Amino acid sequence: MHHIQTADLRFSADNTPVSDRFDDIYFSTQDGVAESRYVFQQGNALWERWSACQDIHFVIAETGFGTGLNFFAVTTLFRQFRRQNPQSPLSRLHFISFEKYPISAEQLAITYQTFSEFSALAAQLQQWWQINGIPIEGCYRYHFGETTLDIWFGDVNTQLPQLGDYMQNRIDAWFLDGFSPSKNPDMWNETVYRLMYRYTKPQGTFATFTAASAVKKGLESAGFRVEKRAGFGKKRECLYGEKPAENAPHFTASQVNTPWFLPQAAKFDGAADVAIIGGGIASLFSALSLLERGADVTLYCEDDELALNASGNKQGAFYPQLSDDDERNIRFYIHAFAYGLQRLQWAVAHNVPFEHRFCGVALCGYDEKSAAKLDKISAYQWDKKLYAGMNREELAQTVGLPLPCGGGFIPNGGWLAPRQFVQNAFRLLESSGLSVKTAQKITALSSTKNGWTLQNAQGETFRHNIVVLANGHRLHRFEQTARLPLYPVRGQVSQIATGENLLKLNSVICYDGYMTPADEAKTSHCIGASHVRDCENREFSTTEQQENQAKIQKNLAMDWTHDVDTSDNRARVGVRCAVRDRIPMMGNVPDFDRQTEEYRNLFNLRRRKQPVLVAANFENLYLVGALGSRGLTSAPILGECLASLIYGEPLPLSEDIIHALCPNRSWMRKLLKGTPVK
């Protein structure tokens, strides 16, 4: 995990931002906005191409986010285009940018004091940077209405490859910005140019402010057709060009580095007709992201009400999983947490009523093993907005009650009422066109020429083009998902009465369990949860109730824990869906029989460097599952990632994380080693 260094930025006498690190200005001192419009918008002929575009989204990629001027300018242009062309099929703009040294939220605010036309957009981005910071490298997704911004923080040489096989032939236009090639040579290199070519659509374009001969030769060597035109202001010339259609290699499996993990977009015409099977938080965020893209979405819930299973607790903790031996899993949860904060703020802004407090989450080093894990976490130089290590006195002062140990604190974490949130958010989505069908137990799926037929327990059938399975521990009950290595985990959460001491708790505390602060009525707390693998029984357990009380009194052996009393037997039992490697599943539903047959000799094919087929999946069938005990944190980014995949848009996670989420990953680990899968 690499942490992000911020920019060495100062403002000149005329308020132009200047980089001390690169000894260069961020944009023209003559007119930065005019320069952006001339070099990048006109250089890529954006308005003309948008007017002729028959696709529903257009993808721009940029090297060097800087102050965000190019993004704000093109977002403003796209909004103007949409107002003037409301009937155009092009309804969404996707902007990808790379930045190694981001400016701070405060510097962003100063920069846009002189650009009033972009002040609202800049203020929105500034708000997210102030709340969340930029804790680690990787992709951070932000929504600006019809425009989506993905900023990949880190070195472009390491981040650009993480767009991966999936992004081959998907980018429409490039803004080659960043500082002068002579002052920032690490960014202007043949590896970047080759990846640009790979990711660019046939007849996709690029534009840049420079006319340096090394840049021109590098782009031509990669395969682009390069032209010169008059430069902006004092610059004599600048470059623009395209990826020739006649030279563009056909997309074949042999060009894909990891075809067994290649995500596959849905096939549909017109509006996507999507069925979601489920009724909890994974279904909610999948539905939200699909509706935002204009999909027709129908939800089929087995229960009589929504959020009756794992999403049905009175209070649940919201924070990233940091104590994992797999560094990739930690990165996933940090990015999921950052995106989840945005989605919860979206709910607040849309007046979704739900109890919540962003009161922070304390991680307690209650024994030798947990303390060692927290020491390992603290060894990273985290952004303080994400995590801060604390000694016993500091942690106790932060949470409001005495503690026997130190640990760490996640200031933007907190708690929310999952059932209340999910049910009320679904009501909001219904007003936006979501169709909800409860008491619909879907028992079978069958593929048809135009999509899928769903059959319920009464024998009724429903037809949809695309199906998303998000039904928790019931996910593997279909013929198509029966071989997935999922298992149920029963969890009992105890609800306890508050008291004078317990009311002092002002943050969620985690030990070998967790306890929330009092609810908004100041009457009760939640503690939990039990963990019983391979159990779907939802009956109340006196033993588990007593264990929940015993754990906090053992792990945090302070006088106030004696006020924790579960004897009134108030509790709720849910069943979670889990998987052994502790990271969710998201993506295409794999065809087990075909994949194990076609990849049975994969080990030797790779050793001999022979072509390998793209993975055989069930067309237009997707899943989100195995969220375990971190569904509140992971569901928002998983739902967004799934919707992006269905629509063939850029994905908000790095390729290595996408691979880790692939539902066929456990089979592929064996097949890649030459081990048979049974």
Curated annotation (Swiss-Prot):
Region listing for tRNA (mnm(5)s(2)U34)-methyltransferase, in residue ranges: 1-244
Cellular compartment(s): Cytoplasm
Cofactor: FAD
SUPFAM superfamilies: FAD/NAD(P)-binding domain
Catalytic activity: 5-aminomethyl-2-thiouridine(34) in tRNA + S-adenosyl-L-methionine = 5-methylaminomethyl-2-thiouridine(34) in tRNA + S-adenosyl-L-homocysteine + H(+)
Keywords from the UniProt entry: Cytoplasm, FAD, Flavoprotein, Methyltransferase, Multifunctional enzyme, Oxidoreductase, S-adenosyl-L-methionine, Transferase, tRNA processing
Name of the protein: tRNA 5-methylaminomethyl-2-thiouridine biosynthesis bifunctional protein MnmC
Organism: Actinobacillus succinogenes (strain ATCC 55618 / DSM 22257 / CCUG 43843 / 130Z)
